[in-house]
Structures are given as structure tokens and as C-alpha cells.
Swiss-Prot record:
Lineage: Bacteria, Pseudomonadati, Pseudomonadota, Gammaproteobacteria, Alteromonadales
Gene name, Swiss-Prot/TrEMBL: secB
InterPro entries associated with the record: SecB (IPR003708), SecB-like_sf (IPR035958)
Family annotation (PANTHER family): PROTEIN-EXPORT PROTEIN SECB, PTHR36918
CC terms in the record's Gene Ontology section: cytoplasm
Native species: Pseudoalteromonas atlantica (strain T6c / ATCC BAA-1087)
Name by which UniProt lists this protein: Protein-export protein SecB
Amino acid sequence: MAEENQTTPADAAQAAQGPQFAIQRIYTKDISFETPNSPAIFQKEWKPEVQLDLDTRSALIEENVYEIVLAVTVTAMLGEETAFLCEVQQAGIFAIGEMPEQNKAHMLGSFCPNTLFPYARETISNLVNRGTFPPLNLAPVNFDAIFAAYMQKRAAQQAQEQAPTQLDA
């Protein structure tokens, strides 16, 4: 006789109350692409120095629903001249149910930006291509490491602020 997988109402209620996560929407919030030194920049040998800057922010928009914005700025320089400057704000609306604050902070600061990054990377690649520059393939970003470094820095700052001050006698 085959075993049946039965779920009791108590099991279902417990599962429903566990941590929950859902992506409600992913969208591009803002885009900018500049080629301040065109068309002269197209005549130069293409050996750029590429700088990648990342920033994230989150905002509670209603109970347990957050907007996360991942801002990605890519600057390509040829010597002292800017070949292009590409800025993308990739955003998402995420429903994050009740969970411990540490877990929620990780979701907001690492998991959600990690979800958004491939969309931003694709948008940047398309913009660079439309600017007629050689392909730009951004490497994956370790948002877990970035978030861990941020949390360590924040903990060190809080410890420093709470440290008792010594007075010289």
C-alpha cells in the first residue's frame, strides 16, 4: 500500500505562518546613458578603465511590502576622458512576511539586490551596445559579502558609540 502524504490543518496553519517572500514587481526606475566625448572618443583605441559603483536602498511602502532600489553606475574612461557613463536604477517590490529582523535585514540588503542585479546588468549591456561601444559584460556581484561587510562596519560603529569615554584625571 502506498503511503499518502497528508497535511493536517495545524500543519497547514504553521506553514502559512512561516517566513514568506514574494516578488510583486521588477521594474526600471531610472536610466541615464551619456557619451560626453563623442564622436571623438570613437576614434581612440578601446582600452577602457571601467569603474562599477553599487548602491542599494529600501523603503517600506506598506505593511510587509518593500521597494528595493539597486543603483548601478558604470563609468568607462579612456585615459582622462569619459567614454561613457551609464546609470541604472533597477527596482523591485517585494513582499516579505514576518521573520526575525536579522533575516529581514539580509533579505533587504542582500537577497533582493541579488535578485535585481541581472536585470540591471542586462539593461546596462543593452545601453552600452546601443551606444555602439564594444560589449560590456559585468561580472556577478557577491551581495552577501557586501552585506556582511556593511553589517560588520555598522556593528563596529555602534560599539564605538556605546564605548564608555575615559576622562584623564
